């Protein structure tokens, strides 16, 4: 009996030891991985020999130096060497330092990430302690769901911004771009849209933003939505690799919540700085420019990022993406803006001249388009908006004529109506960031037009600030 007990004890001990080994080597931190050595060092990248057969584009590697282990991404693979861009600037790199393959970069989001601010590596930067990790690790370089497995986009929602809810209404699962030059009000409009109450979760990627604005945006703008929001931050002084990764990390977090059935709002400010980061990395890898200094990889990565947003499969939720595009020199046909416009489901154009007049948000209702507007409008609303756009167009095209005194009342009924009603429409569209979101934009507009028709036009100004 004693012998049998000893054999059972030895067997159980061996099994426990074997299980421990399996668990240990299943962990990527302990697994045996191929490695190489640093061969050359240049500003923004370094080359490694001995890894060409073992890595793929986009794989992460760990560079071991005298100060610790630092991450890098493989951006070019050649027969005898690979080119690696370090993730963080200032990493100390020496010739013959050891470099180990890590594979795809993965994160494990959970609901506990809500209310937190993290960097592009999914590390907390808000001083609130460590992040709890989920059960499923997701690659940030994931692909979009197959098109035929996705639900249709059907349900409209209220943003609370009258200029958008009337002229360019949105649907859950839509991807919308906000196009504007610098200093026109993109971030301000995004902050107004972030307060929409139609979403279970909000994920925000702040890419290349000024450091002083990050805390203001998160704490002042989100308000009650802060508890259901995750902010991913890569400021302008961080490396191009981190600025490139931030939107990918954000959309991966949004995918986690969508797959659980949540309706998610994804805000990226801005995709242009994401494109600039890709350009910096591609230039370091030796990729030639093809369009105004942008390499081909920019126009490959943009659709990969944007197509990951949208509706999920049956039973899943949606990702409604609202992204900002900074147009260089107010040129709305620059390569990044033109490429993004062709991918997105609509675009809001912010006009600098409207901002200079003090009309906020400076949304140009004639140039802004929502490709899914018909799913959000009722038939009567669609007819009304078509009529409103006609009046606004008539009002704007005759502005010079009226300035030189060439307008005579009674000669053109449409122009007479435009002159009476368009200023009222413009007044209704004005909203300041601190105002409560509009509950029903069409009702506000109808009330203002009725007041103007009764000769009480000043009362229309009182609409601003009503919820």
From Swiss-Prot:
It catalyses: ATP + H2O + 4 H(+)(in) = ADP + phosphate + 5 H(+)(out). ATP binds at residues 180-187. Pfam families: ATP-synt_ab (PF00006), T3SS_ATPase_C (PF18269). Its main location: cytoplasm. Its EC number is 7.1.2.2. One of its GO terms (biological process) is protein secretion by the type III secretion system. InterPro entries: AAA+_ATPase, ATPase_a/bsu_AS, ATPase_alpha/beta_chains, ATPase_F1/V1/A1_a/bsu_nucl-bd, ATPase_T3SS_FliI/YscN, FliI_clade3, P-loop_NTPase, T3SS_ATPase_C. Coiled coil: none annotated. The keyword Endoplasmic reticulum does not apply. One of its GO terms (molecular function) is ATP binding. SUPFAM superfamilies: P-loop containing nucleoside triphosphate hydrolases. The keyword Oxidoreductase does not apply. It is found in: Cytoplasm. Probable catalytic subunit of a protein translocase for flagellum-specific export, or a proton translocase involved in local circuits at the flagellum. Belongs to the ATPase alpha/beta chains family. PANTHER family: ATP SYNTHASE, SPI-1 TYPE 3 SECRETION SYSTEM ATPASE. This is Flagellum-specific ATP synthase. It comes from Rhizobium meliloti (strain 1021). The lineage of its organism: Bacteria, Pseudomonadati, Pseudomonadota, Alphaproteobacteria, Hyphomicrobiales.
């Amino acid at each position: 009996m004693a012998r049998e007990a000893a054999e059972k004890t030895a067997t159980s001990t061996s099994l426990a030891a074997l299980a421990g080994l399996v668990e240990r080597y299943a962990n990527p931190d302990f697994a045996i991985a191929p490695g190489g050595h640093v061969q050359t060092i240049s500003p923004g990248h370094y080359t490694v020999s001995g890894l060409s057969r073992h890595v793929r584009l986009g794989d992460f590697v760990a560079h071991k130096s005298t100060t610790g282990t630092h991450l890098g991404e493989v951006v070019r693979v050649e027969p005898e060497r690979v080119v690696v861009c370090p993730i963080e600037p200032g990493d100390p790199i020496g010739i013959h330092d050891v470099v180990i393959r890590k594979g795809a970069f993965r994160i494990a989001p959970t609901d506990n990430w809500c209310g937190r601010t993290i960097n592009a590596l999914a590390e907390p930067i808000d001083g609130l302690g460590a992040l709890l990790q989920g059960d499923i690790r997701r690659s940030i370089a994931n692909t979009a769901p197959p098109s035929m497995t996705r639900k249709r986009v059907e349900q409209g929602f209220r943003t609370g911004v009258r200029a958008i809810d009337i002229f360019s209404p949105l649907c859950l699962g839509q991807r919308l771009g906000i196009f504007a030059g610098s200093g026109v009000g993109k971030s301000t409009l995004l902050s107004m849209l972030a307060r929409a109450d139609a979403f279970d979760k909000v994920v925000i990627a702040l890419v290349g933003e000024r450091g002083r604005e990050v805390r203001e945006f998160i704490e002042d703008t989100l308000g009650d939505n802060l508890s259901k929001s995750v902010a991913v931050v890569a400021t302008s002084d961080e490396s191009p690799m981190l600025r490139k990764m931030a939107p990918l990390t954000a959309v991966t977090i949004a995918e986690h919540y969508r797959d659980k059935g949540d309706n998610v709002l994804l805000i990226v400010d801005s995709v242009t700085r994401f494109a600039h980061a890709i350009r910096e990395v591609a230039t370091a890898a030796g990729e030639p420019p093809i369009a105004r200094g942008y390499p081909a990889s920019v126009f490959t990565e943009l659709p990969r990022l944007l197509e990951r947003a949208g509706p999920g499969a049956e039973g899943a939720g949606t990702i409604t993406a609202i992204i900002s595009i900074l147009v260089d020199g107010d040129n709305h046909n620059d390569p990044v803006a033109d490429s993004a416009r062709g991918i997105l489901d609509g675009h809001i154009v912010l006009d600098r001249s409207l901002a200079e007049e003090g009309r906020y948000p400076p949304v140009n209702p004639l140039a802004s388009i929502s490709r899914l507007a018909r799913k959000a409008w009722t038939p009567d609303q669609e007819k009304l908006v078509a009529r409103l756009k006609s009046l606004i167009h008539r009002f704007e095209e005759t502005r010079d004529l009226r300035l030189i005194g060439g307008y005579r009342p009674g000669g053109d009924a449409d122009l007479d109506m435009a002159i009476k009603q368009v200023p009222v429409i413009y007044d209704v569209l004005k909203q300041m960031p601190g105002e409560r979101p509009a509950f029903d934009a069409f009702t506000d507009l109808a009330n203002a037009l009725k007041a103007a028709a009764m000769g009480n036009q000043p009362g229309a100004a009182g609409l601003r600030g009503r919820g």
